[in-house]
From Swiss-Prot:
The protein's name: Mitochondrial distribution and morphology protein 10
Organism for this UniProt entry: Clavispora lusitaniae (strain ATCC 42720) (Yeast)
InterPro entries reported in the protein's UniProt record: Mdm10
Source organism, top-level taxon: Eukaryota
Pfam families to which the protein is assigned, alphabetical: MDM10
Length: 459
């Protein structure tokens, strides 16, 4: 689960049209979210408040071994108007999960907004207690496609009392590149990522059978000047969506030739509420291998009894997998009136407006009319255009689904462990609790490695 400060940082990127998925470090972000999620340790309480559209503060307390905590502050020159607290935020925004890759999409801004975005900046600082540990971050937009990112840590327990990392990033729909310098070991780095695919601005009649199929190829190079040690890794990511079901999938292949390590992942969103991930690691120097499997399962809020007849009728129409679509709270979201004449509905004169996914752009890019799902199988339009409608409708259903909780799980054969994480709502709080169980290598008996619970509140 994201902290509120991480959530605000993602909203800042979205409001300034900065594509996080187009960065080399996030090539395997989906598999990391489904397999390498963290388990809370002990009990923790996070309380955050957003005083204005430009500033926010946060405090956390935990009792892991000793009572400790932190104070944080964030300032954004760009107003973050579409952010929400833990009471209203959707779980899709609060929890890291499957990412649909769209490197060619960029938000639209007016001339006034563009000038503000080009000068946008974000300041973040956190102080830990007890102790004197500090951390800070600065994000400064240089132009519409470039930004400066600076991260600093001040801790007496690390070498020289602290370290600083500077990123100069350029992010365009076709490629991205980063120049990195770290004061630790005088480390120099370069990352690049190039996307092979067709932009979404292409005419719909020319869209191939698999829409938004993108192949991303990237690499990173490192050199530590003090230790005179190099580093190298490469990665390939393939992302696509099926036109028959609209379900996206992502495959990645990463390789570190110096260490002899290769890793492949396969991630697929099997329905609106479920995702499955698998990862295979192999080292050609030691011949060691490992297989990891993870899943993510969302739970819907129980729909009102008024809509049960409607969903029963819709399941009789197999034009798309209606049994995987989320129940919605407003008939106007469905786009069509129910066909069951035995049930009457009282529609309001004006449809109610609601914001479900603040991180997604508030335009019509995803928000198509879902009534296009209920067309007759005898399509009188091109198959590619109808396939595009199915994919957009599936994505629209994911964004507008009202989930009450999410369950994550992962296991690793080589590590002989199982992790479970549950994130849900309790009144105005977001609750995250989980457990990690390992097998003792000597007795082969299960033992609890980590267990905890986190309560988060933001307003």
């Amino acid at each position: 689960m994201y902290t509120h400060m991480e959530y605000l940082q993602r909203c800042f990127y979205k409001s300034t049209s900065w594509n996080e998925d187009n960065i080399y470090a996030n090539v395997t972000a989906t598999s990391q979210a489904l397999l390498d999620f963290s388990i809370p340790s002990g009990a923790k309480l996070d309380v955050s408040t957003q005083a204005t559209d430009h500033s926010a503060s946060s405090m956390s307390l935990s009792n892991m071994h000793t009572i400790n905590g932190s104070l944080a502050y964030l300032f954004s020159s760009t107003p973050l108007k579409n952010t929400m607290g833990t009471r209203d935020v959707s779980l899709q925004d609060a929890v890291a999960g499957f990412r649909i890759i769209e490197p060619f999409f960029s938000g639209t801004h007016t001339k006034t907004d563009s000038s503000d975005v080009n000068r946008a900046s974000l300041l973040y600082g956190r102080m830990y207690f007890p102790g004197t540990a500090l951390e800070a971050m600065l994000i400064k937009r240089i132009s519409a496609s470039a930004q400066l990112l600076v991260k600093c840590i001040n801790n007496p327990h690390i070498r020289k009392g602290g370290t600083m990392i500077v990123y100069l990033q350029e992010n365009t729909p076709r490629f991205s590149r980063e120049y990195i310098y770290s004061t630790n070991e005088a480390l120099f780095g370069f990352r690049c990522l190039y996307n092979f695919g067709k932009p979404t601005k292409i005419s719909p009649a020319l869209i191939p059978k698999f829409d938004n199929s993108v192949v991303s190829v990237g690499a990173e190079f490192w050199y530590a000047a003090l230790g005179m040690s190099p580093g190298l890794s490469t990665a390939v990511r393939y992302s696509t969506r099926s036109t028959s079901t609209g379900k996206p999938l992502t495959m990645t292949l990463a390789c570190n030739p110096i260490l002899g390590h290769i890793s492949s992942t396969y991630n697929v969103k099997t329905s609106v509420s479920s995702t499955v991930c698998s990862k295979y690691d192999f080292n050609w120097f030691s011949y060691a291998s490992n297989l990891s499997i993870g899943f993510e399962l969302y739970n819907f809020f129980k729909p009102s009894h008024v809509f049960k007849h409607y969903h029963a009728d819709q399941r009789r129409n197999p034009s798309i997998h209606h049994d995987t679509l989320a129940p919605v709270a407003d008939p106007y979201v469905l786009g069509t009136r129910p066909t069951n004449n035995s049930v009457s509905y009282a529609f309001p004169e004006k449809p109610r407006k609601r914001v479900v996914n603040s991180i997604q752009n508030l335009d019509d890019y995803y928000h198509i009319n879902p009534s296009r799902l209920h067309r007759s199988p005898a399509y009188d339009v091109d198959d590619d255009v109808s396939g595009r409608s199915v994919m957009e409708a599936f994505q629209n259903s994911v964004n507008e689904s009202n989930f009450s909780s999410v369950l994550k799980g992962s296991t690793s054969l080589s590590d002989r462990m199982v992790k479970l994480l549950w994130v849900g709502r309790y009144k105005d709080f977001l609750v995250s609790t989980g457990i990690k169980v390992n097998l003792n290598p000597f007795t082969n008996l299960p033992e609890i490695n980590k267990i905890g619970v986190t309560f988060s509140y933001a307003c």
